[in-house]
């Protein structure tokens, strides 16, 4: 009988292990969809990813609008006259004092990249408008200069500068360094 008990014990152990393995696989199969549904989908990941913009077709004086993370961005190719005017502006007289050099990349003063939403209530300003030739918000009359600094109206702050970098002389990466 001893050999029969050993065989029965071995068979019983095997059934315990097999049942536990099937049970674990079943739990994993049921849990897997719940775990994966907590991950962001591909559209969400892509929406926050940096984007590269080819700026070679943007002529001097032109403003283009692109979208990053669902928000509009202005890219302005400033003229030498605009750069000179903005660098000479009295920073102390501004509503939100900020020098022109703090709003552009060193050596690339001809390119200005800012969010295209008025800092008052989020309307999209019109380019090459207003008393300073920058942007004019048609909703409540805020005016920005060619550096995106608020000059007049209810807007409390300058147009924000998004994180960006120059990949090369003809390409800007918006969202660089953002996780």
From Swiss-Prot:
Membrane topology, from the record: Single-pass membrane protein
Top-level taxon of origin: Bacteria
Family matches, as NCBIfam families: Rieske_proteo, TAT_signal_seq
Subunit structure: The main subunits of complex b-c1 are: cytochrome b, cytochrome c1 and the Rieske protein.
GO MF annotations, alphabetized: 2 iron, 2 sulfur cluster binding; metal ion binding; ubiquinol-cytochrome-c reductase activity
Binding site for [2Fe-2S] cluster: 118, 120, 137, 140
Source taxonomy: Bacteria, Pseudomonadati, Pseudomonadota, Alphaproteobacteria, Hyphomicrobiales
Subcellular location(s) per record: Cell membrane
Name of the protein in its database record: Ubiquinol-cytochrome c reductase iron-sulfur subunit
UniProt-listed InterPro entries: Rieske_2Fe-2S, Rieske_2Fe-2S_sf, Rieske_Fe-S_prot, Rieske_Fe-S_prot_C, TAT_signal, TAT_signal_bac_arc, Ubiq_cytC_Rdtase_Fe-S_su_TAT, Ubiquinol_cyt_c_Rdtase_Fe-S-su
S-S bonds: 123-139
């Amino acid at each position: 009988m001893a050999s029969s008990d050993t065989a029965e014990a071995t068979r019983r152990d095997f059934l315990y292990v097999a049942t536990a393995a099937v049970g674990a696989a079943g739990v994993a199969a049921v849990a897997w969809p719940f775990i994966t549904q907590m991950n962001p989908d591909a559209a969400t990941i892509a929406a926050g990813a940096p984007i590269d913009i080819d700026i070679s077709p943007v002529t001097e004086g032109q403003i283009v609008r692109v979208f990053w993370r669902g928000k509009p961005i202005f890219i302005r190719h400033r003229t030498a006259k605009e750069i000179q005017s903005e660098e000479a502006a009295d920073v102390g007289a501004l509503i939100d004092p900020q020098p022109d050099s703090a709003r552009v990349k060193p050596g690339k003063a001809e390119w200005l990249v800012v969010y295209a939403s008025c800092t008052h209530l989020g309307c999209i300003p019109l380019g090459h408008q207003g008393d300073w030739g920058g942007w004019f918000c048609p909703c409540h009359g805020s005016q920005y200069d060619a550096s995106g600094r608020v000059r007049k109206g209810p807007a409390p702050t300058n147009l924000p500068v998004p994180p960006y970098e120059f990949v090369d002389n003809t390409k800007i990466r918006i969202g660089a360094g953002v996780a």
